Each structure stands twice: as C-alpha cells, then as structure tokens.
Amino acid sequence: MKKLLFLSFAVLIGLASCQQKGGSNTTVGEYFAPADSGVQVAGIKMVSIQTPVGKFRVWTKRFGNNPRIKVLLLHGGPAFTHEYLECFESFFPKEGFEMIEYDQLGSYYSDQPRDSSLWTTPRFVEEVEQVRQALKLDSSNFYLLGNSWGGLLAM
C-alpha cells in the first residue's frame, strides 16, 4: 500500500511539473517548412537554382567519394525521375566512382512549378550548369551520364 501511495504521489509531482511555457509565434506552416541548413542527410542536398520566374530547389543525392571521378546522372523526361538510375548505386561507388543522382525541376523530389514557360531545352541546360556549379564539379573531376532527354542535355 505504501508503494502504491508513493508511486501515485511521484506521478502527481511529475504531472504537475509538466506545464507549457510561453507560446511561440511560429505558425504551423513555418514550423514544417523545409530549411536547407547545408547539411547533407544520407548524401541528399537540395540545390537552389535561379530561373526566369524565380528561385526553385532541385534534389540531389551523392554516393561514394572520389575527388577525381564524379558522375552526374541526368534522367530522361523531361519530368521523369532519377529512380530508374538507382541501379548504378550498386556499381559506381564499388568501382571507385562518385555519382550524383538529381531530379530536374518538375521531377519527383524537386520543386514542381506550374509555369509552362520553364519547359525549354536552354533553360534545362542552364539548370544543369547551376547544379554543376553548386556541387563544385569542374573539368578536372566531372563527367555527365545522360539517358534519353538527359543525354540531350548532356550534349
């Protein structure tokens, strides 16, 4: 009986100490809005790109680590996804290649603008260039591997 009384008293003390402190001015939308801290989680980094209609973010994911051989994979589409290129995750890093998957604007994990003026080949080519620069890829360490539409952008 004494143990039950002590346990009840401990629970009441614990509950009494749980009080909400001053409210926050943060809205629900602000709380859940994604913030890019620059930290890469599981190799993922959102890259900001500038377009004629504003800034957007595109998704990238890095596998492996090789300062001299980095391969940026360009998927087909436009507006297809990186998913069918995921098979390279099992091969490239094992062979010493660093690879970077990326979803072009309007694709899967990247922003989805509704402005049809963005869907031009020169704008997508400029996007690849902005991604290249943001990921610090240059002629000494960087290769493009594009499939279908991605091959057109790579040329």
What are these regions (language model features)?
Residues 78-90:
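The serine-hydrolase catalytic nucleophile loop
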Residues 92-111:
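Conserved alpha/beta-hydrolase
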Residues 68-77:
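Short beta-strand element of the alpha/beta-hydrolase
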Residues 4-13:
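Sec-dependent N-terminal signal peptides
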Residues 53-63:
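A short loop-to-beta-strand scaffold at the N-terminal edge of the catalytic core in hydrolase folds
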Residues 15-17:
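C-terminal motif of bacterial Sec signal peptides marking the signal peptidase cleavage site
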Residues 122-142:
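Conserved acidic catalytic loop of the alpha/beta-hydrolase fold
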Residues 146-150, 154:
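Gly/Ala-rich beta-loop-alpha elbow adjacent to hydrolase catalytic centers
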